[in-house]
């Protein structure tokens, strides 16, 4: 009866024939399942972007490894900075540098594990995962930038003799030269990790593009 009703409806049979034969004007994105409800198939642009996302997985993994290594070096240098009573905990900004890099290390470990699993399985990341990753990348980049700026300001003050009471002339007279070198190197690696995190964040924007504009 449903077939007769469809054929008897004005233009019903023609529309169905046009869709089945691929006639001009028929929508190629509409698919009619057995239930009779229309579903939207992904556009070619959407599929192309998602394919590129899968191809970038190896590059994204490389960035995560770089972020991990750089942050490990940064917090290791800061933790080992100790000379004539000068340690990282003496300066609040240096403690912040160490804490942020430790957080980034744990975050990148999780991202490395997820990236490897996605590469092995060949699957496309879920939308919710992409949104969470983008947010965490933004937060991590902000924290790394803030930590690097705070550490650099303290290093500049020490180099200019701003802590003369406790440590002579700071890094100038050699009393805490080793401490200064370790701390400054830690700040430099923090900025390098920040730049890598920014690139990861930009890749996150591209990964979200199919869900936002297509």
UniProtKB/Swiss-Prot annotation:
Q: Report if keyword Secreted is assigned.
A: no
Membrane topology, as annotated, equals: Multi-pass membrane protein
Q: Which residues lie on this side of the membrane: Extracellular?
A: 79-99, 160-193
Its domain of life reads Eukaryota
Q: Which Pfam family is one of those matched by this entry?
A: CASP_dom
Keywords carried by this UniProt record: Cell membrane, Membrane, Transmembrane, Transmembrane helix
Q: What is this protein called?
A: CASP-like protein UU5
User: What species was this sequence derived from?
Assistant: Physcomitrium patens (Spreading-leaved earth moss)
């Amino acid at each position: 009866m449903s077939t007769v009703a469809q054929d008897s409806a004005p233009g019903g049979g023609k529309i169905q024939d046009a869709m089945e034969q691929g006639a001009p004007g028929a929508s190629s994105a509409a698919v009619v399942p057995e239930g009779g409800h229309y579903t939207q198939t992904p556009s070619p642009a959407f599929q192309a972007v998602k394919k590129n996302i899968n191809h970038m997985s190896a590059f994204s993994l490389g960035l995560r490894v770089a972020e991990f290594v750089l942050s490990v070096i940064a917090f290791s240098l800061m933790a080992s900075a100790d000379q004539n009573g000068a340690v990282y905990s003496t300066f609040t900004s240096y403690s912040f540098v160490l804490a942020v890099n430790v957080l980034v290390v744990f975050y990148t470990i999780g991202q490395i594990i997820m990236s490897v699993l996605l590469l092995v399985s060949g699957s496309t990341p879920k939308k919710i995962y992409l949104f969470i990753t983008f947010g965490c990348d933004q937060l991590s980049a902000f924290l790394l930038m803030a930590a690097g700026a705070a550490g650099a300001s303290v290093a500049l003050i020490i180099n200019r003799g701003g802590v003369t009471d406790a440590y002579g002339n700071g890094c100038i007279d050699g009393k805490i030269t080793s401490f200064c070198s370790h701390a400054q190197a830690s700040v430099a690696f923090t900025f390098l990790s920040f730049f890598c995190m920014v690139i990861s964040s930009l890749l996150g924007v591209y990964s979200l593009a199919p869900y936002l504009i297509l």
